[in-house]
């Protein structure tokens, strides 16, 4: 038996199928080559890293003294930390030697326990020995806390620090928009080279 309501519902669908089959599809513009996307992303990371470094120098003048005594500087301009009970943090950064970017790195970490929300901060690591830089270079993912000795600088330490008495391999400054972050640490972070 013929049901006019079903037929009425099918007619528009059939008309759309016929119409779409006779229309020439306009080509979509090609995506730019991934290399130009990668170059733009790399340029942004480099610019953000130097901006973070300059921001640190402006808020903590002693940091510039550490830069003068460092063999390399690893800058993560934007680390995002988020979670609820189980959390994580991560971000990309660059390794700078003699004022030039010589490599890209990723930082990641997981954390457990009571936590809620998200925050963003920057981290700068001053490598004061060639051995520490070599350890970073040869590591297939550096678990921070294993290998080179590390000191995380807080506001009190930064004010009283002197580059004449550097005894650790790596000095870390963790900071946000309001300056150095107290109580921040690097245990559990893993730093891995990106690309070659």
PLM feature spans:
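Helix-centric, low-specificity signal for extended rod-like, repetitive segments
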Residues: 14-17, 39
């Amino acid at each position: 038996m013929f049901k006019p309501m079903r037929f009425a519902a099918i007619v528009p669908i059939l008309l759309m199928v016929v119409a779409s089959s006779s229309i020439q599809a306009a080509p979509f513009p090609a995506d730019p080559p991934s290399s130009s996307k990668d170059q733009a992303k790399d340029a942004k990371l480099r610019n953000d890293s130097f901006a973070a470094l300059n921001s640190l120098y402006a808020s903590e003048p002693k940091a510039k003294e550490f830069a003068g005594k460092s063999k390399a500087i690893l800058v993560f301009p934007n680390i995002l930390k988020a979670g609820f009970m189980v959390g994580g943090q991560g971000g990309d950064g660059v390794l700078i030697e003699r004022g030039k970017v010589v490599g890209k790195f990723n930082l990641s970490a997981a954390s457990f326990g009571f936590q809620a929300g998200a925050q963003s901060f920057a981290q700068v690591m001053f490598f004061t020995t060639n051995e520490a830089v070599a350890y970073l270079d040869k590591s297939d993912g550096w678990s921070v806390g294993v290998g080179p000795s590390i000191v995380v600088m807080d506001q009190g330490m930064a004010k009283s620090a002197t580059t004449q008495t550097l005894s650790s391999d790596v000095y870390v400054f963790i900071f946000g928009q309001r300056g150095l972050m107290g109580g921040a640490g690097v245990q559990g972070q893993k730093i891995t080279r990106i690309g070659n």
